Protein backbone atom coordinates (compact mmCIF):
# COMPACT_ATOMS: atom_id res chain seq x y z
CA UNK A 1 0.00 0.00 0.00
CA UNK A 2 1.35 3.44 -0.84
CA UNK A 3 2.26 5.82 2.00
CA UNK A 4 -0.46 8.26 0.94
CA UNK A 5 -3.02 5.46 1.11
CA UNK A 6 -1.80 4.52 4.59
CA UNK A 7 -2.14 8.08 5.81
CA UNK A 8 -5.62 8.21 4.32
CA UNK A 9 -6.62 5.39 6.63
CA UNK A 10 -4.47 5.99 9.71
CA UNK A 11 -4.97 9.70 10.34
CA UNK A 12 -8.79 9.60 10.56
CA UNK A 13 -8.48 6.37 12.51
CA UNK A 14 -6.29 8.01 15.17
CA UNK A 15 -8.70 10.93 15.45
CA UNK A 16 -11.71 8.67 15.89
CA UNK A 17 -9.91 6.47 18.42
CA UNK A 18 -8.82 9.49 20.48
CA UNK A 19 -12.35 10.83 20.50
CA UNK A 20 -13.91 7.50 21.48
CA UNK A 21 -11.29 6.22 23.92
CA UNK A 22 -9.88 9.37 25.42
CA UNK A 23 -6.53 9.74 27.16
CA UNK A 24 -5.97 6.20 28.43
CA UNK A 25 -2.58 4.51 28.45
CA UNK A 26 -0.16 4.11 25.57
CA UNK A 27 -1.12 0.43 25.58
CA UNK A 28 -4.71 1.39 24.76
CA UNK A 29 -3.42 3.53 21.93
CA UNK A 30 -1.40 0.57 20.64
CA UNK A 31 -4.52 -1.58 20.83
CA UNK A 32 -6.35 1.10 18.88
CA UNK A 33 -3.64 1.18 16.24
CA UNK A 34 -3.72 -2.59 15.93
CA UNK A 35 -7.51 -2.46 15.55
CA UNK A 36 -7.25 -0.01 12.70
CA UNK A 37 -4.52 -2.05 11.04
CA UNK A 38 -6.97 -4.94 11.00
CA UNK A 39 -9.68 -2.74 9.48
CA UNK A 40 -7.26 -1.37 6.89
CA UNK A 41 -6.07 -4.86 6.02
CA UNK A 42 -9.61 -5.79 5.03
CA UNK A 43 -9.90 -2.99 2.51
CA UNK A 44 -9.61 -4.05 -1.12
CA UNK A 45 -6.29 -2.19 -1.48
CA UNK A 46 -4.64 -4.44 1.09
CA UNK A 47 -6.00 -7.96 1.41
CA UNK A 48 -3.01 -9.22 3.43
CA UNK A 49 -1.14 -9.25 0.14
CA UNK A 50 2.22 -9.69 1.90
CA UNK A 51 1.06 -12.93 3.48
CA UNK A 52 -0.62 -14.08 0.28
CA UNK A 53 2.66 -13.53 -1.55
CA UNK A 54 4.55 -15.57 1.08
CA UNK A 55 1.88 -18.27 0.79
CA UNK A 56 2.44 -18.54 -2.97
CA UNK A 57 6.24 -18.62 -2.60
CA UNK A 58 6.00 -21.35 0.02
CA UNK A 59 3.54 -23.28 -2.15
CA UNK A 60 6.03 -23.17 -5.03
CA UNK A 61 8.70 -24.49 -2.67
CA UNK A 62 6.40 -27.34 -1.59
CA UNK A 63 5.68 -28.14 -5.24
CA UNK A 64 9.40 -28.36 -5.97
CA UNK A 65 10.30 -30.42 -2.90
CA UNK A 66 7.37 -32.80 -3.23
CA UNK A 67 7.65 -33.01 -7.01
CA UNK A 68 4.14 -31.79 -7.74
CA UNK A 69 2.41 -33.48 -4.79
CA UNK A 70 0.57 -31.84 -1.88
CA UNK A 71 -2.25 -29.98 -3.62
CA UNK A 72 -5.89 -30.84 -2.84
CA UNK A 73 -8.76 -30.95 -5.26
CA UNK A 74 -12.35 -29.96 -4.56
CA UNK A 75 -12.92 -33.52 -3.31
CA UNK A 76 -10.26 -33.04 -0.63
CA UNK A 77 -7.93 -35.66 -2.09
CA UNK A 78 -4.23 -35.10 -2.72
CA UNK A 79 -3.18 -35.19 -6.36
CA UNK A 80 -0.05 -34.37 -8.38
CA UNK A 81 -0.27 -31.32 -10.62
CA UNK A 82 1.71 -28.95 -12.80
CA UNK A 83 2.80 -25.74 -11.08
CA UNK A 84 -0.06 -23.55 -12.32
CA UNK A 85 -2.70 -26.16 -11.47
CA UNK A 86 -0.96 -26.76 -8.15
CA UNK A 87 -1.25 -23.09 -7.18
CA UNK A 88 -4.66 -22.33 -8.72
CA UNK A 89 -6.66 -25.52 -9.32
CA UNK A 90 -9.59 -24.74 -11.55
CA UNK A 91 -12.06 -27.01 -9.75
CA UNK A 92 -11.47 -25.05 -6.52
CA UNK A 93 -11.46 -21.46 -7.77
CA UNK A 94 -14.46 -21.96 -10.06
CA UNK A 95 -16.39 -23.85 -7.38
CA UNK A 96 -19.63 -22.24 -6.20
CA UNK A 97 -18.26 -22.30 -2.65
CA UNK A 98 -15.32 -20.12 -3.73
CA UNK A 99 -17.73 -17.66 -5.32
CA UNK A 100 -19.73 -17.53 -2.09
CA UNK A 101 -16.46 -16.73 -0.28
CA UNK A 102 -16.09 -13.61 -2.43
CA UNK A 103 -19.60 -12.36 -1.70
CA UNK A 104 -19.30 -13.00 2.02
CA UNK A 105 -15.95 -11.23 2.11
CA UNK A 106 -17.51 -8.17 0.43
CA UNK A 107 -20.43 -8.25 2.88
CA UNK A 108 -18.11 -8.61 5.87
CA UNK A 109 -15.93 -5.75 4.70
CA UNK A 110 -18.95 -3.45 4.30
CA UNK A 111 -20.50 -4.34 7.66
CA UNK A 112 -17.32 -4.51 9.75
CA UNK A 113 -16.89 -0.75 10.42
CA UNK A 114 -20.47 -0.59 11.74
CA UNK A 115 -19.72 -2.77 14.75
CA UNK A 116 -15.93 -3.16 14.83
CA UNK A 117 -15.03 0.32 16.03
CA UNK A 118 -17.68 0.37 18.74
CA UNK A 119 -16.78 -3.00 20.23
CA UNK A 120 -13.01 -2.79 19.95
CA UNK A 121 -12.82 0.83 21.07
CA UNK A 122 -14.92 0.22 24.19
CA UNK A 123 -14.36 -3.38 25.30
CA UNK A 124 -10.55 -3.27 25.02
CA UNK A 125 -9.87 -0.03 26.93
CA UNK A 126 -12.61 -0.88 29.47
CA UNK A 127 -10.98 -4.25 30.16
CA UNK A 128 -7.60 -2.56 30.49
CA UNK A 129 -8.95 0.07 32.88
CA UNK A 130 -10.69 -2.60 34.98
CA UNK A 131 -7.48 -4.65 35.19
CA UNK A 132 -5.35 -1.66 36.20
CA UNK A 133 -7.89 -0.62 38.84
CA UNK A 134 -8.11 -4.16 40.22
CA UNK A 135 -4.32 -4.45 40.50
CA UNK A 136 -4.07 -1.07 42.19
CA UNK A 137 -6.68 -2.09 44.75
CA UNK A 138 -5.21 -5.55 45.34
CA UNK A 139 -1.47 -4.81 45.16
CA UNK A 140 -0.87 -1.09 45.07
CA UNK A 141 0.45 1.61 42.78
CA UNK A 142 1.99 0.71 39.40
CA UNK A 143 5.49 -0.73 39.75
CA UNK A 144 7.12 1.46 37.13
CA UNK A 145 9.56 -1.19 35.92
CA UNK A 146 12.09 -0.35 33.23
CA UNK A 147 11.02 -1.48 29.76
CA UNK A 148 13.57 -3.73 28.06
CA UNK A 149 13.43 -5.77 24.86
CA UNK A 150 13.05 -8.89 26.99
CA UNK A 151 9.90 -7.43 28.54
CA UNK A 152 8.64 -6.54 25.06
CA UNK A 153 9.13 -10.15 23.97
CA UNK A 154 7.29 -11.36 27.07
CA UNK A 155 4.46 -8.92 26.39
CA UNK A 156 4.20 -10.26 22.83
CA UNK A 157 4.14 -13.86 24.06
CA UNK A 158 1.56 -13.25 26.79
CA UNK A 159 -0.64 -11.32 24.36
CA UNK A 160 -0.44 -14.19 21.89
CA UNK A 161 -1.27 -16.84 24.50
CA UNK A 162 -4.13 -14.83 25.99
CA UNK A 163 -5.63 -14.10 22.57
CA UNK A 164 -5.24 -17.73 21.54
CA UNK A 165 -6.95 -18.91 24.74
CA UNK A 166 -9.92 -16.57 24.27
CA UNK A 167 -10.11 -17.62 20.60
CA UNK A 168 -10.08 -21.27 21.67
CA UNK A 169 -12.89 -20.77 24.23
CA UNK A 170 -15.09 -18.82 21.81
CA UNK A 171 -14.45 -21.29 18.99
CA UNK A 172 -15.11 -24.31 21.22
CA UNK A 173 -18.34 -22.72 22.48
CA UNK A 174 -19.47 -22.00 18.93
CA UNK A 175 -19.24 -25.71 18.18
CA UNK A 176 -21.06 -26.75 21.37
CA UNK A 177 -23.91 -24.25 21.78
CA UNK A 178 -26.62 -24.75 19.11
CA UNK A 179 -27.46 -21.06 18.76
CA UNK A 180 -23.80 -20.17 18.23
CA UNK A 181 -23.26 -23.12 15.91
CA UNK A 182 -26.08 -21.77 13.73
CA UNK A 183 -23.87 -18.70 13.27
CA UNK A 184 -20.51 -20.45 12.95
CA UNK A 185 -21.65 -23.17 10.55
CA UNK A 186 -21.65 -20.58 7.77
CA UNK A 187 -17.86 -20.73 7.96
CA UNK A 188 -17.88 -24.52 7.95
CA UNK A 189 -20.20 -24.68 4.96
CA UNK A 190 -17.16 -24.03 2.74
CA UNK A 191 -16.72 -27.01 0.42
CA UNK A 192 -13.33 -25.80 -0.80
CA UNK A 193 -10.69 -23.68 0.92
CA UNK A 194 -9.35 -20.42 -0.50
CA UNK A 195 -7.60 -17.50 1.25
CA UNK A 196 -10.97 -15.70 1.32
CA UNK A 197 -12.53 -18.54 3.32
CA UNK A 198 -11.10 -16.94 6.45
CA UNK A 199 -13.70 -14.15 5.95
CA UNK A 200 -16.56 -16.56 5.25
CA UNK A 201 -18.64 -15.71 8.33
CA UNK A 202 -22.21 -15.00 9.39
CA UNK A 203 -22.60 -11.26 9.95
CA UNK A 204 -23.16 -11.91 13.68
CA UNK A 205 -19.88 -13.82 14.06
CA UNK A 206 -17.71 -10.74 13.60
CA UNK A 207 -18.89 -8.92 16.74
CA UNK A 208 -18.29 -12.07 18.80
CA UNK A 209 -14.71 -12.45 17.59
CA UNK A 210 -14.07 -8.70 17.95
CA UNK A 211 -15.32 -8.60 21.54
CA UNK A 212 -13.17 -11.60 22.47
CA UNK A 213 -10.09 -10.10 20.84
CA UNK A 214 -10.62 -6.75 22.53
CA UNK A 215 -11.07 -8.42 25.91
CA UNK A 216 -7.82 -10.37 25.61
CA UNK A 217 -5.81 -7.35 24.43
CA UNK A 218 -7.30 -5.15 27.14
CA UNK A 219 -6.61 -7.54 30.01
CA UNK A 220 -3.00 -8.14 29.00
CA UNK A 221 -2.51 -4.44 28.28
CA UNK A 222 -3.81 -3.61 31.75
CA UNK A 223 -1.36 -5.95 33.47
CA UNK A 224 1.65 -4.60 31.58
CA UNK A 225 0.55 -0.98 31.92
CA UNK A 226 0.42 -1.52 35.69
CA UNK A 227 3.84 -3.20 35.69
CA UNK A 228 5.53 -0.34 33.85
CA UNK A 229 3.37 2.62 34.85
CA UNK A 230 2.66 3.27 31.17
CA UNK A 231 2.40 1.65 27.78
CA UNK A 232 4.68 -1.02 26.37
CA UNK A 233 4.99 -1.97 22.72
CA UNK A 234 5.22 -5.45 21.30
CA UNK A 235 8.49 -6.79 19.92
CA UNK A 236 8.70 -6.62 16.15
CA UNK A 237 10.44 -8.34 13.27
CA UNK A 238 10.86 -6.29 10.07
CA UNK A 239 8.62 -3.70 11.72
CA UNK A 240 5.82 -6.26 12.07
CA UNK A 241 4.73 -7.55 15.48
CA UNK A 242 5.64 -11.19 16.11
CA UNK A 243 2.01 -11.93 16.93
CA UNK A 244 0.73 -10.25 13.76
CA UNK A 245 3.37 -12.10 11.74
CA UNK A 246 2.37 -15.52 13.08
CA UNK A 247 -1.36 -14.91 12.88
CA UNK A 248 -1.27 -13.28 9.46
CA UNK A 249 0.79 -15.99 7.82
CA UNK A 250 -1.10 -18.83 9.49
CA UNK A 251 -4.44 -17.26 8.60
CA UNK A 252 -3.54 -17.03 4.92
CA UNK A 253 -2.12 -20.53 4.50
CA UNK A 254 -4.49 -22.56 6.65
CA UNK A 255 -7.37 -21.67 4.30
CA UNK A 256 -5.32 -22.66 1.27
CA UNK A 257 -5.79 -25.95 -0.58
CA UNK A 258 -2.12 -27.03 -0.30
CA UNK A 259 -1.47 -29.28 2.68
CA UNK A 260 1.41 -27.98 4.77
CA UNK A 261 2.38 -30.14 7.75
CA UNK A 262 4.85 -29.17 10.45
CA UNK A 263 7.13 -31.78 12.05
CA UNK A 264 5.26 -33.52 14.85
CA UNK A 265 7.37 -31.91 17.58
CA UNK A 266 6.49 -28.45 16.24
CA UNK A 267 2.81 -29.36 15.77
CA UNK A 268 2.65 -30.02 19.51
CA UNK A 269 3.24 -26.29 20.02
CA UNK A 270 2.02 -24.51 16.88
CA UNK A 271 -0.95 -25.20 14.61
CA UNK A 272 0.09 -26.11 11.09
CA UNK A 273 -2.18 -25.26 8.13
CA UNK A 274 -2.81 -29.01 7.72
CA UNK A 275 -4.22 -29.09 11.26
CA UNK A 276 -6.81 -26.49 10.30
CA UNK A 277 -7.70 -28.58 7.25
CA UNK A 278 -8.63 -31.28 9.78
CA UNK A 279 -10.88 -28.78 11.55
CA UNK A 280 -12.74 -28.15 8.28
CA UNK A 281 -13.11 -31.84 7.42
CA UNK A 282 -16.57 -33.40 7.54
CA UNK A 283 -15.25 -36.83 8.56
CA UNK A 284 -16.60 -37.72 12.00
CA UNK A 285 -13.12 -38.60 13.28
CA UNK A 286 -12.12 -34.97 12.58
CA UNK A 287 -15.08 -33.27 14.26
CA UNK A 288 -14.39 -30.72 17.01
CA UNK A 289 -10.60 -30.78 16.69
CA UNK A 290 -7.96 -28.03 16.61
CA UNK A 291 -9.92 -25.00 17.84
CA UNK A 292 -7.08 -22.58 18.59
CA UNK A 293 -5.81 -19.96 16.16
CA UNK A 294 -2.03 -20.13 16.47
CA UNK A 295 -0.72 -22.47 19.17
CA UNK A 296 -1.48 -26.11 19.99
CA UNK A 297 -1.22 -25.54 23.74
CA UNK A 298 -4.91 -25.11 24.55
CA UNK A 299 -6.03 -27.99 22.32
CA UNK A 300 -3.50 -30.21 24.06
CA UNK A 301 -4.74 -29.17 27.50
CA UNK A 302 -8.41 -29.70 26.62
CA UNK A 303 -7.96 -32.90 24.62
CA UNK A 304 -8.98 -31.56 21.21
CA UNK A 305 -5.60 -31.69 19.45
CA UNK A 306 -5.38 -33.72 16.24
CA UNK A 307 -2.10 -33.91 14.32
CA UNK A 308 -2.69 -35.27 10.80
CA UNK A 309 -0.38 -37.63 8.99
CA UNK A 310 1.12 -36.67 5.66
CA UNK A 311 -1.51 -36.37 2.91
CA UNK A 312 -4.34 -37.37 5.26
CA UNK A 313 -7.72 -37.28 3.51
CA UNK A 314 -9.67 -34.20 4.59
CA UNK A 315 -12.89 -33.63 2.62
CA UNK A 316 -14.18 -30.15 3.44
CA UNK A 317 -17.68 -29.05 4.24
Protein language model features and the residues they cover:
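Membrane-embedded catalytic scaffold of the fatty acid hydroxylase/desaturase
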Residues: 107-120, 126-137, 141-315
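Short, membrane-interfacial amphipathic segments enriched in basic
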Residues: 24-29, 85-96, 265-268
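Interfacial loop/helix-cap signal at membrane boundaries in integral membrane proteins
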Residues: 22-39, 84-86, 134-147
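Short, strongly hydrophobic alpha-helical membrane anchors
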Residues: 1-43
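Interfacial loop-to-helix junctions that mark the boundaries of transmembrane helices
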Residues: 42-46, 232-234
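Short, charged cytosolic
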Residues: 16-24, 69-90, 172-188
Amino acid sequence: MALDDQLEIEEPADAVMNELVGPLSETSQEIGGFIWQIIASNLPRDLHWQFLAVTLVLAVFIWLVRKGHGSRGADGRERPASLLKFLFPRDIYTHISARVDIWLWVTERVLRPLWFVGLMATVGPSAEFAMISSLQLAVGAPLGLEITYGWMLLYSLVTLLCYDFVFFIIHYTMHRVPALWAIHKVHHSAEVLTPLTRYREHFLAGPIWAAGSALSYGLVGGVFTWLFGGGITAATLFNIGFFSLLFGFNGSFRHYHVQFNYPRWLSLWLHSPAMHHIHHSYLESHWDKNFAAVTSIWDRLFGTLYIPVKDEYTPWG
